[in-house]
Amino acid sequence: MPTIVNCPTCKSKVEWSEQSPHRPFCSKRCQLIDLGEWSFENNRISAPITSAEDFSQDMIEDIEAMMAKNEDDFFK
């Protein structure tokens, strides 16, 4: 049974599958409307941005270890 979601823009039903290339949006139009909302800063992420002070030393070391495993051209 396919998963059905509501288009974030127009609320119409969208099947979450490869046959819906703009998922979770129902169309390219709704996808672009949403992009415009973000570009005009009408949408925001509700959680506060985490400051570096909120990271423990262990977390920082874990992130650095993961980054060290990437190829040298990862950030280019």
UniProtKB/Swiss-Prot annotation:
Cofactor note: Binds 1 zinc ion.
Amino-acid positions noted as binding Zn(2+) in the UniProt annotation, renumbered to this chain: 7, 10, 26, 30
Keyword Methyltransferase found: no
The protein's required cofactors: Zn(2+)
Biological process according to GO: regulation of DNA-templated transcription
GO MF: DNA topoisomerase type II (double strand cut, ATP-hydrolyzing) inhibitor activity; zinc ion binding
Entry-linked SUPFAM superfamilies: Glucocorticoid receptor-like (DNA-binding domain) (SSF57716)
Annotated InterPro entries: DNA_gyrase_inhibitor_YacG, Znf_NHR/GATA
Keywords in alphabetical order: Metal-binding, Zinc
Origin: domain of life: Bacteria
Pfam families listed in its UniProt record: YacG
PANTHER family for this protein: DNA GYRASE INHIBITOR YACG
NCBIfam families named in the record: PRK00418.1 (NF001638)
Family to which this protein belongs: Belongs to the DNA gyrase inhibitor YacG family.
Self-association state and partner proteins as the record states: Interacts with GyrB.
HAMAP family: DNA_gyrase_inhibitor_YacG
Functional note: Inhibits all the catalytic activities of DNA gyrase by preventing its interaction with DNA. Acts by binding directly to the C-terminal domain of GyrB, which probably disrupts DNA binding by the gyrase.
Name by which UniProt lists this protein: DNA gyrase inhibitor YacG
